[in-house]
């Protein structure tokens, strides 16, 4: 049986609420990268070592993962209309705390926790809101919004940090102002669309009779990724999603520091752009159709992720910026496909509330992988040196990718005979046999 969700009413209030929710979620993701180009500055100003910088960067994941897991198991998603304003307000307070952290370094950690909390609270809530407002067209929003937010947030943070004064303050101030404006639009949307996702009003899915049902497909936009059954518990898909987010975290949270530490370049702008190319290319690849029309299988994106990061590590060991850049570009293409396709596979046919919960679980797992990889990279760099630590984590990443691909292929073999559900398909299958 195929489950389809009808889109919400197309009135102005619904559009305003959906728009404010979507833009706010993207801005929250942007805020998660505000600190990225500032890490070398914190290392110089506060005397942080590689491990301390990695822990500071990864502190964001702690609150994020805990809240996402609570959202997936508890009633938070059913209170989307309350959770979203709290999420946006938390992001604003986190920015203010991190501004003060320029003078009091210990405050950077609770500020980073608040940033993670804001992303976590908005993740499931925005997913539910977008599906309720836009129907199936909103189902792919989480992957698209995450990639857009990560890419644009990093670009903006780099430009502000390099070209504007008071870099440890200005980045957060700009983000806080943008979030405040979006919060105002969100309140206006909530008032204009009082019935959309009101408590205890999960939209009733449209059930299509089995004999008339299409083969279930994970809607990613222009392309339907065909699956034979629900993959909401597919470990391979979850692991590919974690690898996709981990490569972005490693590229922007670890690689620029490694480039500067090894003397491959002494330019903050160059180091950030080489590492940040992963997220920037990921965002552009998303618009170019990666995960939509090309590279739409989990083994393909898993292979790209492993290949990309292996090339980047080889470039770091050789001291060649162009090789590192090639690796981060390939990894960015893999990230765009990996996160989007994996999320599409595990959320096929879900209602808005189910979508929010599964998306929250998936995001928690993906961010867990990113946080673990970044912390391990920092610890390995502290113990074995910059190059030795990077090579160690590169091997761990490649092995994990191989395991993920193996799990996906094993699942695919078990479901190699798809069910033919439409009469016309049965006739075609009989003719072919």
Segments (PLM) and residue ranges:
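Conserved MFS/SLC helix-loop-helix module at the cytosolic interface between two early adjacent transmembrane helices
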Residues: 66-102
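Structural signature of the two symmetry-related core transmembrane helices
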Residues: 82-96, 297-312
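Hydrophobic core of transmembrane alpha-helices in multi-pass small-molecule transporters
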Residues: 106-121, 322-337
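Cytoplasmic helix-loop-helix junction between adjacent transmembrane helices
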Residues: 111-146
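Intracellular juxtamembrane helix-capping segments at the cytosolic ends
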Residues: 121-134, 336-350
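Helix-loop-helix hairpin linking two adjacent transmembrane segments in secondary transporters
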Residues: 141-190
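Transmembrane alpha-helices of Major Facilitator/SLC transporters
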Residues: 271-294
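A late C-terminal transmembrane helix in Major Facilitator Superfamily
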Residues: 343-386, 394
């Amino acid at each position: 049986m195929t489950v389809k969700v009808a889109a919400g009413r197309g009135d102005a209030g619904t559009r305003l609420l959906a728009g404010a929710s979507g833009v706010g979620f993207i801005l929250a993701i942007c805020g998660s990268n505000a600190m990225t180009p500032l890490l070398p500055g914190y290392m110089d100003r506060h005397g942080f070592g590689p491990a301390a910088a990695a822990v500071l960067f990864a502190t964001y994941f702690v609150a994020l993962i805990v809240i996402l897991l609570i959202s997936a198991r508890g009633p938070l998603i059913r209170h989307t209309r309350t959770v979203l304003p709290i999420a946006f307000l938390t992001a604003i307070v986190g920015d203010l705390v991190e501004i003060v952290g320029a003078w009091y370094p210990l405050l950077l950690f609770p500020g980073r926790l608040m940033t993670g909390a804001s992303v976590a609270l908005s993740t499931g809530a925005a997913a539910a809101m977008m599906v309720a407002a836009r129907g199936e067209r909103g189902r792919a929003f989480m992957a698209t919004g995450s990639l857009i937010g990560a890419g644009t947030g990093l670009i903006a943070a780099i430009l502000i940090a390099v070209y504007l004064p008071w870099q440890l303050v200005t980045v957060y101030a700009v983000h806080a102002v943008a979030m405040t404006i979006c919060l105002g639009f969100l309140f206006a949307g909530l008032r204009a669309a009082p019935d959309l996702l009101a408590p205890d009003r999960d939209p009733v899915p449209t059930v299509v009779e089995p004999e008339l049902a299409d083969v279930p497909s994970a809607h990613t936009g222009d392309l339907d990724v065909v699956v034979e059954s629900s993959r909401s518990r597919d470990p391979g898909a979850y692991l590919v999603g974690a690898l996709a987010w981990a490569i972005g975290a490693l590229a922007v949270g670890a690689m620029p520091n490694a480039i500067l530490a090894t003397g491959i370049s002494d330019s903050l702008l160059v180091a950030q752009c080489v590492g940040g190319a992963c997220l920037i290319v990921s965002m552009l690849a998303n618009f170019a159709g990666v995960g939509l029309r090309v590279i739409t299988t989990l083994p393909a994106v898993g292979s790209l992720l492993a290949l990309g990061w292996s090339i980047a590590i080889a470039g770091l060991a050789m001291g060649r910026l162009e090789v590192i850049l090639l690796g981060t570009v390939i990894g960015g293409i893999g990230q765009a496909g990996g996160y989007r396709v994996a999320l599409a596979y595990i959320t096929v046919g879900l209602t808005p509330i189910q979508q929010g919960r599964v998306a929250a679980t998936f995001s928690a797992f993906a961010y867990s992988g990113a946080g673990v990889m970044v912390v391990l990279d920092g610890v390995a760099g502290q113990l074995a040196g910059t190059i030795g630590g990077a090579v160690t984590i590169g091997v761990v990443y490649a092995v994990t990718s191989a395991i993920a691909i193996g799990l996906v292929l094993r699942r695919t073999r078990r479901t190699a005979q798809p069910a033919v559900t439409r009469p016309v398909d049965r006739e075609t299958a009989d003719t072919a046999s």
